[in-house]
């Protein structure tokens, strides 16, 4: 027996292990195609479909970002830009459940001033077992138990909000979306008042360790293959973004370029 899961004109969203699910998702932008003339990116609707019967159900309208499946393929996490909440979709039951209201803080960019729904602050990553997702608010990381057994937990223990600093994962050649229990993540702490930035190490118990900090904006370019060394730069209004070399914990830094000496 063949069952149509989705029309050929839509985007089917399948996780790894999809053969074990009862429900999957697809997105359909066809209701919004007339808006292509004035929108950079078309919104889309999200449907769930029973893979056994082909029965389809509309579960989200006018989305801007596609759902993301957990690494174990059991749940899809998706941000509803109209309701301004995060939901989870259960691939076994087809149910959609709000997972962010219990946090108590906005999960969307409150100062967003473009003619479109405010986007979410985003997803920081997942635990290796796929049962938890880490979401950003304006300042901190929140650990959400997708099994529903535990309430949301502020991984960073409110440090970011208390000190007015936004804690975000830094981009590099070794950054990850999936974190082991002993993972240590390189994050930036950006002060919204002074614009100063710090580079810290965050572990999965929420402990922060300062690596470097100052009146700069930092960018990590690359860690060495053995993860012992790093190339990065820092800059501010009076210092050009020269390259620096250091150990992977940013100790013993050495300036390796002098590209714009007249700025000093």
Feature names for model-found ranges:
Residues 9, 20-26, 42-84:
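A conserved hydrophobic secondary-structure block that centers on an alpha-helix together
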């Amino acid at each position: 027996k063949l069952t149509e899961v989705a029309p050929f004109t839509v985007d089917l969203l399948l996780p790894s292990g999809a053969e074990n699910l009862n429900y999957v998702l697809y997105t359909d932008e066809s209701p919004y195609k007339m808006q292509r003339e004035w929108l950079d990116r078309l919104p889309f609707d999200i449907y769930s479909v029973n893979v056994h019967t082909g029965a389809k159900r509309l579960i989200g309208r006018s989305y801007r970002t596609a759902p993301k499946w957990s690494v174990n393929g059991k749940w899809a996490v998706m941000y509803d830009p109209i309701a301004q909440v995060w939901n989870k979709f259960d691939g076994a039951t087809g149910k959609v459940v709000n997972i962010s209201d219990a946090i108590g803080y906005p999960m969307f960019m409150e100062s967003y001033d473009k003619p479109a729904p405010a986007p979410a602050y985003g997803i920081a990553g997942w635990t290796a077992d796929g049962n938890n997702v880490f979401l950003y608010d304006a300042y901190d990381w929140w650990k959400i138990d997708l099994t529903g057994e535990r309430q949301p937990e502020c991984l960073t223990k409110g440090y970011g909000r208390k000190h007015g600093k936004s804690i975000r994962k830094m981009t590099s050649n070794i950054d990850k979306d999936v974190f082991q229990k002993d993972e240590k993540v390189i994050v930036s702490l950006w002060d919204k008042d002074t614009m100063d930035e710090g580079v810290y190490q965050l572990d999965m118990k929420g402990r922060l360790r300062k690596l470097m900090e100052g009146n700069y904006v930092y960018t990590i370019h690359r860690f060495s293959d053995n993860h012992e060394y790093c190339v990065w730069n820092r800059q501010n209004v009076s210092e050009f973004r020269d390259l620096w070399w250091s150990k992977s914990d940013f100790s013993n830094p050495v300036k390796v370029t002098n590209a714009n000496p007249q700025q000093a």
